[in-house]
Amino acid sequence: RRVWTRSRGKRGSAPGTLYRHFRTRDALLEAVYRTEVEKLASAGQELALRLSPPEALRSWLLLFVDYIAAKKIIAPALSTLVQCHPKVVEASRTQIHDAIQSLVRRAVESGDIRTDLDPIDLLSAIVGVAHVPAIPDWQQCARRLVDILIAGSRPVK
């Protein structure tokens, strides 16, 4: 905690400023968590506007890998959030599911992805790699897996 408050002070936000806006450390963590989920969810819409459907899906899945990496770093603190604020976690899950379902639906409609693809399977595969303890470079593995998943999701001709 000391390092956290010292590093915030160096960047111009003293602990008093933080606690004026967030009454507790948990409130700050919840705000950060919500913001990260909202950024991930809105990235899906932004990517869909400027990239082809399969490339938008691929790019979003790579952002999802980064999101998981950030969650792993703050996992001990997140356990309190999960226990005390299950509605926050459920709302976040819904936002993430909506984002990937929209991207997959767009890719299916364009004919670039198979019609039998379940978007949650993509997320589950990446989360699974992130939680294998024997993979020290899981992020690189997950990034390679994204390309494998996209290639394997193409329609069979």
Residue ranges of model-derived segments:
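Helix-loop "lid/cap" segments that line or gate small-molecule binding pockets
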Residues: Q45-L49, L62-I68, L81, L149-S153
